[in-house]
Amino acid sequence: MKLKTKASIKFGICVGLLCLSITGFTPFFNSTHAEAKSIEDTNMASCITNKKFVQLEKKFDARLGVYAIDIGSNKTIAYRPNERFAYASTYKVLAAAAVLKKNSIEKLNEVIHYSKDDLVTYSPITEKHLDTGMSLKEISEAAIRYSDNTAGNILLQQLGGPKGFEKSLKQIGDHVTKAKRFETDLNSAIPGDIRDTSTAKALATDLKAFTLDNTLTTDKRMILTDWMRGNATGDELIRAGAPIGWEVGDKSGAGSYGTRNDIAIVWPPNRAPIVVAILSNRFTKDANYDNALIAEAAKVVLNDLK
């Protein structure tokens, strides 16, 4: 595939340039020898990690977008970080976070009523509460923990629709994500269509802003991360690639063209957390996704950041 060839060429160029520096040429004119060696070692490690992602793309016949931020060291891992992918249901954690930001804790307890006509495909929680309605807090939890699509739509409505959701992301510095549609149309993932797409870097940065920075108050951050820790749809994704004893809170997503995504906060024992976004797709509309791709990519990321 042309896509894979480009990635392989890029890796070859990367190694080639590093070889020049190893054999005597160095662009670090103003650095000490030790500084240059440190940068050289870091770049070589990055190339080796990228090669592993290239190999995963070949193994699973897929395209990957990866971005991770180690909060303690500020080290990042990036692979196709600025390429667009359909965000699919990963938006639900960001929409819930935006709803948390917009409303007081008391307001979250207000009951929202909806009708049978509002229900869309895959709404395992909201479909059980047509008669009683659900609180905004319960709706947010259903969207994150169970990826309930009607709950996702209600969150979007609370923000003023997809346009309002996009605006809420712009307020935290995200001018990349393009939100245009409701569930379930937003999962079409048509190649070249930028509607309802984002990048691994943008989604990871958004998640960091809502869960670890000061965008939300401490009590609201705790509510959000508790929902993520209880996600029922992510056991085979980033969580499966994490070392034993590392806690993961995530939000998964899936769509057409073999789209499979997961964005997460990972808490290693006794150290600062890691933010990870792994996005993927394949090349035909009815292609199936493989959860193992996300798990193996996560393993590469987290092993590199150990």
UniProtKB/Swiss-Prot annotation:
GO BP: any one term: response to antibiotic
Enzyme class: hydrolase
Annotated InterPro entries: Beta-lactam/transpept-like, Beta-lactam_cat, Beta-lactam_class-A, Beta-lactam_class-A_AS
Keyword match Manganese: no
Residues at which substrate binds: K251, S252, G253
Active site positions: S89
GO cellular-component term (any): extracellular region
Transmembrane region(s): none
Location relative to the cell: Secreted
GO molecular function terms attached to this record: beta-lactamase activity
Similarity field: Belongs to the class-A beta-lactamase family.
Function comment: This protein is a beta-lactamase with a substrate specificity for penicillins.
NCBIfam families in UniProt: bla_class_A, classA_firm
Name of protein: Beta-lactamase
Species whose genome carries this gene: Bacillus subtilis (strain 168)
Name of encoding gene: penP
